[in-house]
């Protein structure tokens, strides 16, 4: 199905604040976030429509939280299957690892299956909310150049017409074969897996069993995944000497499917495609006024479903910083923290994905035997087994430097980690997720205390100019105690008791949360002012105009 934006009228020449190359998921998320921040954005896409065939099939809790930040999560959820377990099977069908993480610390299920084209369509439609965002399809980026204060892009339409775009910044979301990255000669180091995989998508799921199964068969490893809307995906390793053309032949496709279906002739094929798995990482994510994101910056095997989710992390990390710089609220040195924070974690996710692929299809037969033996031994080590089955091995993003203020012992500090998102009770009695109360803003969140108490008038002025929300968390039973109200502070009740537990664990009563929901700093009321001054310096924040209104509550 062709998916195109109905309200977009192309122009010959364009002048915008941000140009985004690529209307894939990362480019669309960047455009939605920047759009809601009032930034003038132009997305240019080489294809004439969104890609309409399934690619990624796993979306995690962090990516859903990112969707929530741009007001689209409720439209995305109908295209997901929550709590999607991953089960590893021996060649005889014995389940030796059942990964079923049941935590929802960030407000959403940790593992979910999804249909990418439908979610991409939700993000594209989301752009129609913003008159300051345009998306042009069938535009090939032929060349670009950087000047001191802008980037000039040269485009060619499908009819051969030329167009010019002048932008303050260019975000390259143009995929693993990124034209932008290659033009800038940014090394893309890593390796390509020797084996290819053929992906077969089938409508009216002929199995209809839930979850995803990875069968570690040394003869031909395969994957069977239940997807939303009754779609079944099979992935089979392409063996040496086989070609895509051969496997597409009806008799060979029937032979493949007979491995997993009792009646391989009675299926509704959607499509078959052969993929090569790459593990590569760009040496640099920022080159002056050009920033690389998503597959243009890193690509990884599919086995942990983290390629898509890593791209969402890029978009969430970069978009708020870019908005602050364009709005004049921070200097462009803030953008250097994008690579500083995201590159190491992208590398960790690449390594995890490669390892998972080696578990499914070990390069050596003896490694498969070792894997099966270790999995059997884990049954006698319940704590170790839970570590794997609850997916605690997944490297959670943690930043040790960048746009944050870390003091004291780094190992146990919450600074640089994503803040939790429990349910909270508002003063009108409504119960909602924490981010819904905050919006796409900074937040200073205090347990029991007035978060403005330790701030000077100048600090209140500076942080309010950023759109910061000041939140006082109280036990839910205290939410209607009127004498505790403070002007300019939103009071919320700790519905589930999770915020109290978080503050008790981390020996702090105040947390500064960034727009991407990461903890930028912690403090107590008497140290908050000093901490905010240091944080403003680290983030290269500028001083607001003197006419910004100030309310100081003692």
From Swiss-Prot:
Role of this protein: Catalyzes the insertion of one atom of molecular oxygen into position 2 of the phenyl ring of 3-(3-hydroxyphenyl)propionate (3-HPP) and hydroxycinnamic acid (3HCI).
Reactions performed catalytically: 3-(3-hydroxyphenyl)propanoate + NADH + O2 + H(+) = 3-(2,3-dihydroxyphenyl)propanoate + NAD(+) + H2O; (2E)-3-(3-hydroxyphenyl)prop-2-enoate + NADH + O2 + H(+) = (2E)-3-(2,3-dihydroxyphenyl)prop-2-enoate + NAD(+) + H2O
Pfam families linked to this entry: FAD_binding_3
The protein's annotated pathway: Aromatic compound metabolism; 3-phenylpropanoate degradation
Required cofactor(s): FAD
Record's protein name: 3-(3-hydroxy-phenyl)propionate/3-hydroxycinnamic acid hydroxylase
InterPro entries cross-referenced by the UniProt entry: 3-HPP/3HCI_hydroxylase, FAD-bd, FAD/NAD-bd_sf, PheA/TfdB_FAD_monoxygenase
Gene Ontology process terms (BP): 3-(3-hydroxy)phenylpropionate catabolic process; 3-phenylpropionate catabolic process
């Amino acid at each position: 199905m062709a998916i195109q934006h109905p309200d977009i009228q192309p122009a010959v020449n364009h002048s915008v604040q941000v140009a985004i190359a690529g209307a894939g998921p990362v480019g669309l998320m960047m455009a939605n976030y920047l759009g809601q921040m009032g930034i003038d954005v132009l997305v240019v896409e080489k294809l004439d429509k969104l890609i309409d065939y399934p690619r990624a099939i796993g979306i995690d809790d962090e990516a859903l939280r990112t969707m929530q930040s741009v007001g689209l999560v409720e439209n995305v959820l109908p295209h997901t299957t929550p709590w999607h377990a991953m089960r590893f099977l021996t060649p005889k069908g014995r389940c030796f690892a059942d990964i079923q993480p049941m935590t929802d610390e960030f407000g959403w299920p940790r593992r979910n299956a999804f249909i990418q084209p439908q979610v991409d369509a939700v993000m594209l439609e989301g752009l129609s909310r913003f008159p300051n965002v345009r998306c042009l399809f069938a535009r090939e980026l032929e060349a670009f150049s950087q000047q001191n204060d802008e980037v000039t892009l040269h485009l060619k339409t499908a009819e051969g017409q030329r167009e010019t775009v002048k932008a303050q910044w260019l975000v390259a979301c143009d995929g693993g074969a990124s034209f932008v990255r290659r033009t800038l000669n940014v090394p893309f180091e890593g390796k390509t897996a020797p084996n290819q995989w053929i992906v077969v998508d089938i409508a009216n799921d002929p199995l209809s069993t839930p979850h995803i199964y990875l069968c570690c068969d040394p003869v031909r490893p395969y994957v069977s995944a239940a997807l939303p809307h009754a779609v079944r995906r099979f992935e089979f390793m392409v063996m040496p000497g086989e070609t895509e053309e051969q496997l597409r032949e009806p008799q060979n496709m029937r032979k493949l499917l007979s491995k997993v279906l009792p009646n391989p002739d009675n299926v509704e094929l959607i499509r078959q495609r052969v993929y090569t798995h790459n593990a590569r990482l760009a040496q640099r994510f920022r080159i002056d006024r050009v920033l690389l994101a998503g597959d243009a910056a890193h690509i990884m095997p599919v086995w942990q479903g983290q390629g898509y989710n890593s791209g969402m992390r890029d978009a969430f990390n970069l978009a708020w910083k870019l908005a602050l710089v364009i709005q004049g609220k921070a200097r462009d040195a803030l953008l250097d923290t994008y690579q500083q924070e995201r590159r190491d974690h992208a590398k960790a996710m690449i390594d995890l994905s490669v390892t998972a692929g080696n578990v499914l299809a070990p390069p050596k037969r003896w490694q498969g035997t070792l894997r099966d033996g270790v999995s059997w031994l884990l049954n006698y080590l319940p704590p170790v087994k839970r570590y794997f089955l609850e997916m605690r091995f997944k490297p959670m993003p943690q930043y040790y430097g960048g746009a944050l203020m870390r003091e004291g012992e780094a190992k146990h500090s919450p600074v640089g980690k994503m803040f939790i998102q429990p349910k909270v009770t508002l003063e009108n009695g409504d119960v909602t997720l924490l981010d819904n109360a905050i919006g796409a803003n900074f937040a200073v969140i205090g347990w029991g205390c007035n978060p403005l108490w330790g701030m000077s008038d100048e600090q209140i002025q500076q942080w309010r100019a950023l759109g910061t929300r000041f939140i006082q968390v109280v036990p839910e039973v205290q939410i209607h105690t009127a004498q505790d109200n403070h002007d300019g502070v939103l009071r919320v009740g700790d519905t589930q008791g999770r915020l109290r537990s978080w503050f008790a664990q981390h020996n702090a009563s105040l947390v500064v949360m960034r727009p991407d929901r990461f903890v930028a700093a912690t403090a107590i009321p008497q140290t908050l002012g000093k901490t905010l001054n240091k944080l403003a310096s680290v983030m290269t924040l500028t001083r607001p105009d003197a006419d910004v209104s100030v309310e100081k509550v003692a």
